[in-house]
Amino acid sequence: PQAESAASHLLAEAVEAEFRQGRVTARKVRRLGAIVLADTPVRPTPEAGRAAVSAALRRDGLALLDWSTAARDLRGRLALLHRELGGPWPDVSDGALLQRLDDWLGPELQALAEGAAVARIDLAGPLRNLLPWPEAARFDELAPEWLEVPSGSRVRVAYPVPGEETTRPVVAVKLQECFGLAESPRLAGGRVPVLFHLLSPARRPLAVTDDLTSFWSGPYAQVRAEMRGRYPRHPWPEDPWAAPATARTNRRN
């Protein structure tokens, strides 16, 4: 205490908050210069908590947040439209979202600052709020969440998010469900053909193409020769143009 009194000008007390492992924590630290005299866990103030979250996100990136499948898909759809059509579709790259943190994620930042776990934060809602109006009315048409294939199945479209190497939307579907499909659907107002991952009955990739006409007219014959003996219960017709598309096996048909 006497030493503290003599060096009172070196005494400092502050609440230090940090965002680690998906939560904001804080401690009250009393220091004498570089020496820690006391370190006590405390509840962070909203201001300190919010500053800690913002600092961590800007330092370590948006991967600190909990990206659900719905949020990732929504971000990928927005990224496609911004890349292909430009404004008013929003830039959802890491840099753009970090620059506008308070604009699009304000209430969620506040919830984290007040102690909410990152796993409880739904990012799909804030991202959807970035949709421009009135253009948002065409969002599902320009970048659909699902596509219907000739078998009648609705298949989810996988959109890459900013930072991934590929920029192509992908549909992964069993080959038999696409018999007769001549052209790959095109997204973003006809600018981007969907890349089809045509799968075996065991859902292993047999072909990757956005030119289905060329596939049925050429490589399909080799795929058929290799697969019909391995999967005899599934249709492998000589003429894939005339065969009915199906998700079923021969026995069930």
Predicted regions and their residues:
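Short, surface-exposed, low-complexity cationic segments
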Residues: 161-194, 198
